Amino acid sequence: MPLFIVETSCSLISWLFLYLLLCHLNSGRDSEWNCRLVTLFHGILIICLTAYIGFIAGPWPFTHPGTENTYFQILTLVLSLGYFLFDMAWCVYFRTEGPVMLAHHTMSIFGILLALGLGESGIETCAVLFGSEITNPLLQARWFLKRMGCYDSLAGDVVDLLFILLFASVRIGVGSRMLYCELTSPKPSLIVKVGGVAIYTLSWIFMVDIARFACRKTCGKYRRWKEQYKLDGVNGHAVKIK
């Protein structure tokens, strides 16, 4: 336990140091800009680490849930735990996120603590982290495009489309398969299975919000296209009369 506290504290301090360093280097930017950079770095790092764990180091999470944690899994989980503690504290202090996102962070923290405390189910926890973070770079890119005034462009449309497709296919599609394997396997403990159901339910809450956003954006673009089409028709008719 003392070693775990030291490791988690080192992880938390490392993320805090990175944030403070970015604040120093980007003094012209606000705190959220620098926090988003930390979030982006964490997302890319965890995607790479969990992809290596799942696809190369093994074991395969769909066939071996509930197995004993490996050193590399523990390292990845501790790194991510430190980040979520940092980001949770930052979000609460600056009041930038709503209850759903705070619930996601809380579940992530407890899920990682559970896997580390039990000494097992690290592989499926890493798989969940991979699914959660795979859309993170796109989410941050969307925010940065908005801040730079470039969101209402082809780049913004591409980022949104890729985000929706990735979220639906990985977090909902692959996530459904992962949850099924978790629930049907006799190895994972009951509390881990309950946690898996909770995370999956939260993913569906996000999915409903994303679907509503997609409908609003599509309808808005269609209305603007129709208005532009009518305007072009009127202008063309006026030219013919002249």
UniProtKB/Swiss-Prot annotation:
One of its GO terms (cellular component) is membrane. The keyword Transmembrane applies. The chain crosses the membrane at residues 3-23, 37-57, 74-94, 109-129, 154-174, 190-210. It is a multi-pass membrane protein. Keywords: Membrane, Transmembrane, Transmembrane helix. It is found in: Membrane. InterPro entries: TLC-dom (IPR006634), TLCD5 (IPR042512). Residues 28-219 form the TLC domain. PROSITE patterns: TLC. Pfam families: TRAM_LAG1_CLN8. Its main location: membrane. Belongs to the TLCD5 family. This is TLC domain-containing protein 5.
